[in-house]
């Protein structure tokens, strides 16, 4: 289970641990158990965390957010980012789950029938589009040169692995939210998750990194680097 993910990590030389979501499910306690393990392994080290879509499975967004807010009070080194900014050691971290928009082609409803998010998260459909719009507005306003940005969903089509590019107008529309070019080029580093393929590329002066473990029982990403360290 998730213990294999935690066991794979090496805290040596780490000043800040960044987790871009899908760490566990709030309902049922797997997220809480994961952070009990992480808080022990990274004792005294700040942990930047944001929720992915899996954290919300089996619950409503409002209820899950209340539980995560309480979780941060149990672990003082845990910093939950959701349309907010935290500064650690003089470095700004700006974060948002981000989600995905209701595309103007009117096809979201048709494709949504195949996405677990719409079936396993309560009170989701209108919430997700409103939340995405608020997140895009927040990041557009908040991100400054030199920032480190963390999102769960992919912020640009360039961050989609080539094997999924054929589907970005289909089911893949729920993987990303295309941010404006000027926002993408503003920070120096942008971490994201959601996809289970490692990615590393640049847009303007910003480096984009995705380093996912993937589903723990499938060992599906052989390129996952448990010792990935980025200097900022």
For each predicted feature, which ranges?
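Active-site-proximal beta-strand elements of phosphoester/diester hydrolases
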Residues: 1, 90-99, 148-152, 207-213
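Active-site environment of divalent metal-dependent phosphoester hydrolases
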Residues: 1-5, 25-29, 54-64, 85-87, ...
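N-terminal active-site segment of His-dependent metallophosphoesterases
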Residues: 1-50, 55-63
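Active-site neighborhood of phospho(di)ester-bond hydrolases with catalytic His/Asp-centered motifs
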Residues: 17-22, 48-53, 79-83, 148-151, ...
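Soluble or luminal CAZymes and related metallo-dependent hydrolases
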Residues: 27-30, 63-67, 127-138, 171-178
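A basic- and aromatic-enriched beta-loop-alpha substructure that forms the phosphate/nucleotide-
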Residues: 46-119
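Binuclear metal-dependent phosphoesterase catalytic core
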Residues: 76, 86-87, 161, 170-189, ...
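Active-site-proximal loop/helix segment associated with metal-binding centers of metalloenzymes
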Residues: 94-170
């Amino acid at each position: 289970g998730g213990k294999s993910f935690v066991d794979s990590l090496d805290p040596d030389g780490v000043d800040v641990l960044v987790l871009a979501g899908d760490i566990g499910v709030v309902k049922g306690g797997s997220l809480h158990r994961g952070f009990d393990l992480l808080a022990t392994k990274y004792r005294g080290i700040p942990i930047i965390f944001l929720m992915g879509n899996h954290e919300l499975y089996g619950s409503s967004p409002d209820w899950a957010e209340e539980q995560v807010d309480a979780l941060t009070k149990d672990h003082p080194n845990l910093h939950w980012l959701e349309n907010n900014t935290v500064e650690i050691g003089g470095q700004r971290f700006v974060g948002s789950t981000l989600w995905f928009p209701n595309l103007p082609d009117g096809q979201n409803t048709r494709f949504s029938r195949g996405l677990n998010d719409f079936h396993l998260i309560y009170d989701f459909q209108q919430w997700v589009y409103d939340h995405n719009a608020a997140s895009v507005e927040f990041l557009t306003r908040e991100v400054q040169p030199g920032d480190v940005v963390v999102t769960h969903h992919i912020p640009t089509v360039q961050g989609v692995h080539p094997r999924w590019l054929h589907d970005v107008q289909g089911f893949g529309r729920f993987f990303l939210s295309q941010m404006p070019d000027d926002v993408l080029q503003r920070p120096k580093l942008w971490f994201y998750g959601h996809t289970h393929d490692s990615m590393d590329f640049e847009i303007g002066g910003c480096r984009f990194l995705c380093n996912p473990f993937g589903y723990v029982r499938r060992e599906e990403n052989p390129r996952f680097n448990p010792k990935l360290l980025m200097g900022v």
